[in-house]
Amino acid sequence: LSFRDIHGQPVQLQDYLGQPVVINLWATWCPPCRREMPVLQAAQEKTPDVTFVFINQGESTLHVQHFLAAQELSLDNLLLDSNAHMGQAVSSLSLPTTLFYDAEGRLRNNHLGELSKASLNHALQSIYKESL
């Protein structure tokens, strides 16, 4: 699948192969998504050997930029999926959905709903174990 980053540049998910990847499907209108963003941002900062990819589902660049500024969030690898193709591809029925891939690109875990710090840490351990 191919997406656009916040600057309009095309990005493909296979560009992130080579280390564990956490993909978070989210939207600004989703209260659990909004609540878990600080947890994900903190994990992104504390685990540089894991790539965090945030794929917004169906919203405009401007809307997402305003949300990030208002919430004072700094997310790496922020992608826009204007037609929610990723959600369809992984059969996500609701948001947020978080997918955990090992360094070879194999799905090792997924989480539907809001992630707590503890549940995120547990899922991260599972992709580390699988990558060893």
Per-region residue spans from a language model:
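Structural microenvironment flanking redox-active thiols in thiol-disulfide oxidoreductases
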Residues: 34-71, 82-88
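Active-site acidic short loop of glycosyltransferases
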Residues: 17-19, 49, 73-75, 92
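Conserved redox-active cysteine motifs that mediate thiol-disulfide chemistry
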Residues: 17, 25-42
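A short beta-strand-turn-helix
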Residues: 1-21
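Hydrophobic beta-strand anchors of alpha/beta hydrolase catalytic cores
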Residues: 22-23, 52, 98
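Small/polar loops that bind or transfer phosphate-bearing groups
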Residues: 25, 55-56, 112
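Thiol/disulfide oxidoreductase modules built on the thioredoxin-like
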Residues: 67-74, 80-128, 132
